[in-house]
């Protein structure tokens, strides 16, 4: 297969990439312009976790109804599933460049709709548009970069797409933090995404189509012009010859260079094996929990005992920064270490770090501060009803208080030490303000814990190990392993599998104790559509 997976030489591919800055900036321009699609992908993944905290404050219907919160998050994922599935076919039919232009247009429209939404319904419509754009871009960006990159540094350049995904997540947390005090908070958070979409649209208008797609469609001369800009003079003729032989072999084998369908795809042994590997990697990437961690890292931080929204967002910014750093590590090692070895190291580290998180959350939930009758009675007429009527109220601790649901209750810490017994009170904004006025901390998601810093270490380890391997390799492999003729369609199938897996492990709206069990590895809730009897989510502290 032309442009197959390249075996690294003694020269670091990372250094080769850096040298392109002065030797051939055209290649970097192609890679980073297409990689903005990854930036959009990452930004959307990260921004909603912080924006949702403030959307709930503006739209009380969202705060009261778990189903609306679920819809705001998951409709973008549903849109991405459709976008990735349709995008695969469109890539082979219309070309990589046109699909990226369409993705940018959809994302821009979605960002404008969300930023101006007067209610939850239109906000969800905007999320669907954004999802369609993200789905198309998520599989097209690495494909375009792969087909417009010299073989020996292809892995490193496709890893720049991974870097821009994680960079987008980091940017989203930074913007979330920047707008926490601004009027319109969440509208700025979701609206800012329109600018990189517009920038990529303009840049892609000025860039050529993928040379390999052009050659496959019979536009050999146009493809050769682009390849001569990408490859050094002593390599370009061999690359053109390899591409020619690859296309001719496919045409000879299948009898036509244009006709293509799923049956032919599945009858081709190389494609079946590639799909097994490509889809498996994409599914497994989601099942190790990365998007759960990124979507809900502010919530996870609060579960570890950090009460403030702003503190949670700030600590999540550190997490996103580590994710971006891990992508840089991937760029350096992907072509010199190899895909398989990087995956093994990554998965080993992920397992260890999830073990750390499991232990921390187990300790947090089983050793939370007790509820004191003295502290609770300090606040008149706002005691949690379930606590007042409980026969075993002396055994109540903070976690028991947070699980009360008739109505929702919160934990107001001791003014001297948050680990000492505190008060169990009705959860609403008025009570929260009363708690804060006495220099106490207000908890509605997690409880005070002396182990909170270990949760941060566990999160950091998880991201550091995940990002260079499981974060980047699935996208790189899916841009390389398929025959040129099936590359767009197969890449779309694999990306669709990724987004479907993302939706399956979606946890928004699950009760606190179920999220804890998931993080502890005790339960994995595949049936996200079965809500059962769930209490409404509680407002988070600020």
Give the role of each language-model region:
Residues 1-231, 250-542:
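Alpha-helical transmembrane bundle of multi-pass membrane proteins
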Residues 229-239, 245, 252:
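Short intracellular "coupling" helices and adjacent cytoplasmic loop segments at the cytosolic face
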């Amino acid at each position: 297969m032309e442009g197959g997976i390249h075996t690294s030489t003694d020269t670091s591919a990372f250094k080769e990439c850096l040298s392109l800055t002065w030797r051939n900036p055209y290649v970097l321009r192609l890679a980073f312009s297409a990689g903005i699609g990854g930036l959009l992908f990452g930004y959307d993944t990260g921004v909603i976790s912080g924006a949702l905290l403030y959307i709930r404050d503006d739209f009380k219907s969202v705060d009261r109804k778990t189903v609306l919160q679920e819809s705001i998050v998951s409709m973008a994922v549903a849109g991405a599933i459709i976008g990735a599935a349709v995008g695969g076919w469109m890539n082979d039919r219309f070309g990589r460049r046109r699909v990226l232009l369409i993705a940018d247009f959809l994302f821009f429209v979605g960002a404008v709709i969300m930023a101006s939404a007067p209610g939850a319904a239109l906000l969800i419509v905007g999320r669907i548009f954004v999802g369609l754009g993200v789905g198309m871009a998520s599989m097209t960006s690495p494909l375009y970069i792969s087909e417009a990159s010299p073989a020996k540094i292809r892995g490193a350049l496709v890893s720049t797409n991974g870097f821009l995904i994680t960079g987008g997540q980091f940017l989203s947390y930074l913007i979330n933090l920047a707008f926490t005090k601004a009027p319109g908070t969440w509208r700025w958070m979701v609206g800012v995404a329109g600018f990189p979409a517009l920038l990529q649209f303009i840049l892609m208008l000025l860039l050529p189509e993928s040379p390999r797609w052009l050659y496959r469609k019979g536009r050999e001369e146009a493809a050769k012009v682009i390849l001569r800009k990408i490859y050094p003079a002593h390599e370009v003729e061999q690359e053109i010859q390899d591409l020619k032989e690859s296309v001719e072999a496919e045409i000879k084998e299948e009898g036509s260079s244009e006709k293509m369908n799923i049956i032919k795809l599945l009858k081709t042994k190389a494609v079946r094996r590639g799909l097994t590997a490509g889809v498996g990697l994409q599914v497994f990437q989601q099942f190790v929990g990365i998007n759960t961690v990124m979507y809900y890292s502010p919530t996870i931080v609060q579960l570890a005992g950090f009460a403030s929204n702003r503190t949670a967002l700030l600590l999540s910014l550190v997490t996103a920064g580590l994710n971006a750093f891990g992508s840089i590590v991937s760029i350096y090692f992907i072509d010199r270490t190899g895909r398989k070895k990087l995956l093994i190291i990554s998965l080993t580290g992920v397992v260890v770090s999830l073990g750390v998180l499991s232990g921390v959350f187990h300790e947090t939930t089983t050793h939370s501060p007790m509820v004191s009758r003295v502290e609770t009675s300090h606040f008149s007429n706002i005691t949690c009803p379930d606590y007042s009527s409980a026969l075993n109220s002396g055994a109540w601790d903070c976690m028991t208080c947070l699980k009360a649901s008739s109505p929702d209750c919160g934990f107001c810490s001791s003014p001297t030490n948050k680990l000492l017994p505190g008060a169990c009170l009705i959860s609403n904004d008025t009570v929260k303000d009363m708690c804060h006025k006495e220099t106490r901390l207000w908890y509605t998601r997690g409880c005070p814990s002396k182990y909170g810093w270990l949760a941060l270490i566990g999160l950091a380890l998880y991201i550091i190990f995940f990002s260079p391997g499981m974060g980047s390799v699935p996208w790189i492999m899916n841009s390389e392993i398929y025959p040129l003729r099936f590359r767009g369609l197969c890449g779309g199938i694999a990306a669709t599998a990724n987004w479907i897996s993302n939706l399956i492990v979606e946890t928004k709206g699950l009760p606190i104790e179920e999220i804890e069990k998931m993080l502890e590895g005790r339960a994995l809730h595949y049936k996200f559509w079965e809500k059962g009897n769930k209490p409404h989510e509680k407002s988070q502290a600020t």
